[in-house]
């Protein structure tokens, strides 16, 4: 069974592959590769309770291979990608399961340039996790040391603020920030406050168990309510490792990643500073025509931050993102950074002198239903059983410029099912019929239906 998915290693904490023995061996495998480049690895994490175990196991493996480890503590994923470059480290490692609950944990790995490691290196690491590495252990004199990196939070805050136009301030703007009780709990509000905003922070009291629990980008209802209560100009919800952002406007209407990307594309195109952008297969079909109208070449990648970055690099894209809220601004970041993306949105509001609802109102996503379906039987077996029904669905949706996406998640045991088309009634009808068929086949019903 492969331990790497679409975004590093992820699974239930204390269960393979996130058990201490496997994580220790992963640390050794990472150390074996890192020492080919240098002697330092930086290591950050989010706030889930299992992070202590995972951190200890990884550190043991790394120092045993002769690698020094700089501990960052709770920090956003993008902060590690930034600091690995600034500190000239061999690799950066993040302990996080992103938007998953506290029950899970994971490991993401960045190279010395702050880019997620390629598939080929993942395969090497996977092989070495299973290999006998005792002969590769460092001599006692050459074992690594562990130290805490002082001032890392301040460094990252200054980096994020540096992506905001120097002539602008957030004075007079009221912002609600939901930090998801995650890695940005001590950073999210500080960034906007230091730039002059009146900030209302929620989801900033992590206890190791409440990360992403009824808060953050997956559960933005609290943010929406707080925006309406406070009369705020905008709401910004992060996830557990602050690599995705979900926004609501001053009217409490939610804005997804596609709308954020569309707004950024429109603004950058008006300044002639963008020719190419990238999204994944999960993005709305209507964003393609929107980009064409702007004169922007839009490229699509497979789902996942690494695939998106590969596409952006190949086509020299200025901006890229996923509907889920991962936004990459290549001028500033090598991975998705929710705080940098949020400042980009705020700068557009100020430069165009418009409200949040105005800057997002230009792009209308195609009607869709998105269902996350838990499953227990083998996915390939499910795909074979549901195949004829999917063919019928695709044929029906073809009449309304629609499509169906039926794929397994690379980070959770869920099937991602998306039905979209220009006729919302047909989309809803097809989604219901597909759900009925899945129940008949013994697959569990979808959870958290979303109609846009």
Curated annotation (Swiss-Prot):
Necessary cofactors: Mg(2+)
UniProt-listed Pfam families: PGM_PMM_I (PF02878), PGM_PMM_II (PF02879), PGM_PMM_III (PF02880), PGM_PMM_IV (PF00408)
Binding site for Mg(2+): 98, 239, 241, 243
Transmembrane parts of this sequence: none
Active-site residue list: 98
Domain of life according to the entry: Bacteria
Enzyme class: isomerase
Cofactor mode of binding and number, as noted: Binds 1 Mg(2+) ion per subunit.
E.C. numbers: 5.4.2.10
GO biological process, one term: peptidoglycan biosynthetic process
A molecular function (GO) term: phosphomannomutase activity
InterPro entries tied to this protein: A-D-PHexomutase_a/b/a-I, A-D-PHexomutase_a/b/a-I/II/III, A-D-PHexomutase_a/b/a-II, A-D-PHexomutase_a/b/a-III, A-D-PHexomutase_C, A-D-PHexomutase_C_sf, Alpha-D-phosphohexomutase_SF, GlmM_bact
Modified residues (Phosphoserine): 98
Post-translational modifications reported in the UniProt record: Activated by phosphorylation.
SUPFAM superfamilies registered for this protein in UniProt: Phosphoglucomutase, C-terminal domain, Phosphoglucomutase, first 3 domains
Family: Belongs to the phosphohexose mutase family.
Task of the protein: Catalyzes the conversion of glucosamine-6-phosphate to glucosamine-1-phosphate.
Protein name, per record: Phosphoglucosamine mutase
Gene that specifies this protein: glmM
């Amino acid at each position: 069974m492969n331990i790497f998915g679409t975004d590093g290693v992820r699974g239930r904490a204390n269960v393979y592959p996130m058990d201490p023995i496997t994580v220790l061996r992963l640390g050794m495998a990472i150390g074996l590769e890192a020492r080919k480049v240098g002697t330092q690895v930086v290591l950050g994490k989010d706030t889930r309770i299992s992070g202590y175990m995972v951190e200890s196991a990884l550190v043991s493996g790394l120092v045993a291979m002769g690698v020094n480890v700089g501990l960052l503590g709770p920090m956003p994923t993008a902060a590690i990608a930034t600091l690995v470059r600034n500190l000239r480290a061999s690799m950066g490692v993040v302990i996080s399961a992103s938007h998953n609950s506290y029950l899970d944990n994971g490991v993401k790995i960045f190279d010395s340039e702050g880019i997620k490691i390629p598939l080929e290196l993942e395969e090497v690491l996977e092989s070495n996790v299973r290999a006998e590495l005792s002969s590769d252990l460092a001599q006692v004199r050459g074992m690594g040391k562990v130290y805490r990196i002082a001032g890392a939070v301040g460094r990252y805050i200054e980096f994020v603020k540096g992506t905001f136009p120097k002539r602008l301030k957030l004075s007079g703007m009221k912002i609600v920030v939901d930090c998801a009780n995650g890695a940005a709990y001590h950073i999210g509000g500080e960034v906007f406050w230091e730039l002059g905003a009146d900030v209302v922070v929620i989801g900033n009291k992590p206890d190791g168990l409440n990360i992403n629990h009824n808060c953050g980008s997956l559960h933005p209802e609290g943010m929406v309510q707080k925006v309406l209560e406070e009369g705020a100009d905008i709401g910004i919800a992060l996830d557990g490792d602050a690599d995705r952002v979900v926004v609501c406007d001053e009217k409490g209407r939610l804005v997804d990643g596609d709308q954020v990307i569309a707004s950024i594309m429109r603004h950058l195109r008006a300044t002639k500073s963008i020719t190419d952008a990238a999204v994944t297969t999960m993005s709305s079909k209507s964003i393609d025509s929107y980009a064409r109208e702007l004169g922007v070449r839009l490229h699509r990648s497979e789902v996942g931050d690494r695939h998106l970055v590969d596409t952006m690099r190949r086509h020299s894209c200025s901006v890229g993102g996923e509907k889920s809220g991962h936004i990459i601004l290549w001028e500033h970041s090598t991975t998705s950074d929710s705080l940098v993306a949020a400042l980009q949105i705020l700068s557009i509001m100020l430069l165009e002198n418009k409200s949040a609802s105005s800057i997002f109102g230009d792009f209308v996503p195609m009607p869709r239903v998105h269902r996350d379906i838990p499953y227990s039987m083998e996915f390939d077996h499910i795909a074979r059983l549901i195949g004829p029904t999917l063919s019928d669905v695709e044929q029906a949706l073809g009449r309304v410029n629609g499509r169906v996406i039926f794929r397994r998640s690379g980070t959770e045991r869920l099937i991602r099912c998306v039905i979209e088309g220009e006729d919302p009634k047909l989309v809803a009808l097809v989604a219901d019929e597909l759900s009925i068929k899945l129940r008949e086949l013994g697959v569990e019903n979808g959870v958290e239906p979303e109609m846009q």
